[in-house]
Amino acid sequence: MSRKTYEKIANINGMFNMLEQQIIHSQDMAHFRSEFFYVNHEHRENYEALLIYYKNSIDNPIVDGACYILALPEIFNSVDVFESELPFSWVYDENGITETMKSLSIPLQYLVAAALEVTDVNIFKPSGFTTGMNNWNIAQMRIFWQYTAIIRKEAL
């Protein structure tokens, strides 16, 4: 292995160690959320607002994780989030995938689809997870990894 590969492995291991610590210390929610990966300050503000709006996010890690993804500025600014009963109700309806979902960038469509797959809702074939893993850049990967830490915060 070249030194560069070792550095990549060390960085990835460091990120997973950080995510594990977030899960371990998830009972301190203010600290837990302050350590999250946010694409920018707006992402964090949107997330905090959604947690207040979707009150069941406190007891439901799936809703909490959905709020984290929905808070991404590109999604948050495209969706009338406060008209939805659940964070992802805008993704599809009786006619299939909505125009709002189709208007998102392709990597974010995969991210939303991968998050829905956690609840056995599959909107893409191949899956959003599979397609995302083959196409996401490192920031999008970090968003997905953070999402997994949120929904699994009770794992330890």
Protein language model features and the residues they cover:
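Extended, charge-biased low-complexity segments
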Residues: M1-P107, D120-L156
